[in-house]
From Swiss-Prot:
The lineage of its organism: Bacteria, Pseudomonadati, Pseudomonadota, Alphaproteobacteria, Hyphomicrobiales. PANTHER family: 30S RIBOSOMAL PROTEIN S16 (PTHR12919), SMALL RIBOSOMAL SUBUNIT PROTEIN BS16M (PTHR12919:SF20). Keywords: Ribonucleoprotein, Ribosomal protein. The keyword Ribonucleoprotein applies. This is Small ribosomal subunit protein bS16. Belongs to the bacterial ribosomal protein bS16 family. Residues 103-122 have a biased composition (Low complexity). GO terms for biological process: translation. One of its GO terms (cellular component) is cytoplasm. Signal peptide: none annotated. HAMAP family: Ribosomal_bS16. NCBIfam families: S16 (TIGR00002). Pfam families: Ribosomal_S16 (PF00886). The gene is rpsP.
């Protein structure tokens, strides 16, 4: 039985509220779950203690039993110090594309030429 530690949505429209639950991965998002570990309220301030209320010991037990946290729950557990996530980087996405690099090189060359022409020859 593939277990996941994931978020189950509650609350009203545009007022989300999530329960952190352990559930079979084949069950619906808000469907049957095995155990409730805590709550996550994304509308609270990020530094609020009530934003994430979670039983860390139960979470550790379920992870030891083989339950896999989803990405968002892993981030919440990392914030509480229960789990350590590996740092993710996407360096190629930040690089400018080919045409932008060509434009930057051309503008740098033009600026260099202008600086050389403006500087008095001594």
């Amino acid at each position: 039985m593939p277990l996941k530690i994931r978020l189950s949505r509650g609350g009203a429209k545009k007022r989300p509220f999530y329960r952190v639950v352990v559930a079979d991965s084949r069950m619906p998002r808000d469907g049957r779950f095995i155990e409730r570990l805590g709550v996550f309220d994304p509308l609270k301030a990020k530094d609020s203690a009530e934003r994430v209320v979670l039983d860390a010991e139960k979470a550790k037990e379920w992870i030891a039993k083989g339950a896999q946290p989803t990405d968002r729950v892993a981030r919440l557990l990392d914030g509480l110090g229960v789990l350590t996530r590996e740092a993710q980087s996407n360096p190629k996405k930040a690089l400018p594309k080919k045409k932008a690099q060509e434009r930057a090189a051309a503008s740098a060359a033009a600026a260099e030429k202008a600086a050389a022409a403006a500087a008095p020859e001594a």
